[in-house]
Amino acid sequence: MAFENIISAADKARILAEALPYIRRFSGSVVVIKYGGNAMTEPALKEGFARDVVLLKLVGIHPVIVHGGGPQINAMLEKVGKKGKFVQGMRVTDKEAMDIVEMVLGGHVNKEIVSMINTYGGHAVGVSGRDDHFIKAKKLLIDTPEQNGVDIGQVGTVESIDTGLVKGLIERGCIPVVAPVGVGEKGEAFNINADLVAGKLAEELNAEKLLMMTNIAGVMDKTGNLLTKLTPKRIDELIADGTLYGGMLPKIASAVEAAVNGVKATHIIDGRVPNALLLEIFTDAGIGSMILGGGEDA
């Protein structure tokens, strides 16, 4: 046997040994995963994500996936001649855009994720927040530096989540894959930021962890250094000085709210890293940034 193969085998054995206490600790617990970024678009990362999710289920962890679909939505909007516009990280969504959002998220993207997981031996089931009306939504109005209460169309925030549907799937041994579309009081569809849905769902399921996959290493300071632990106070400072802005704002807000409201650990991790989920859950060092719910020192 070549020496490098021996080293590789030894490394694999060490990793398994390191993972064992975490497998024991987290077996039976719920982990909510916000799936987005490059991990959703690069073939190798997509396949790796599906395998990792199946592995989590095999060792007794209950993954619940909430997915985005920004690049796919943008591509479809461009095909029909509509240009995407964002306010404070939220997509402006008129009626025509909402039809496209629902078609892309609930149709193409959701089904592709479900198919990929099932290809690797999982039992994934795709659902939309409109199914059984389990995600109730209300219109989201945005405050900007120029104006308060900006109406950005059929964009919603989570009013309530009935977890019965998701819990039922978990009890049947399935992996729920949730498209972040909610339903209003008149039955109308609302586009909801996937980070918001993931955070609220993690709260309602009393999840052990909330993992948010991104295209960056985590939360960075102005000099580009990774901040591995953050308190709500520190995050407020980073927003005030402009370090955090745009699409990071709803992600950070959801992570903080989940941490404050009982999710045991919330993490922003780099979805470009192969096996990012396993590295965060099953290794001592973990990866990315952890959001603390209290006033602990960061």
Curated annotation (Swiss-Prot):
The keyword Hydrolase does not apply. Its EC number is 2.7.2.8. The record marks K34, K251 as: Transition state stabilizer. It catalyses: N-acetyl-L-glutamate + ATP = N-acetyl-L-glutamyl 5-phosphate + ADP. Keywords: Amino-acid biosynthesis, Arginine biosynthesis, ATP-binding, Cytoplasm, Kinase, Nucleotide-binding, Transferase. The keyword ATP-binding applies. Substrate binds at G69, G70, R91, N191. It comes from the Bacteria. Belongs to the acetylglutamate kinase family. ArgB subfamily. Catalyzes the ATP-dependent phosphorylation of N-acetyl-L-glutamate. PANTHER family: N-ACETYLGLUTAMATE SYNTHASE, N-ACETYLGLUTAMATE SYNTHASE, MITOCHONDRIAL. This is Acetylglutamate kinase. It comes from Neisseria meningitidis serogroup C (strain 053442). The lineage of its organism: Bacteria, Pseudomonadati, Pseudomonadota, Betaproteobacteria, Neisseriales. The gene is argB.
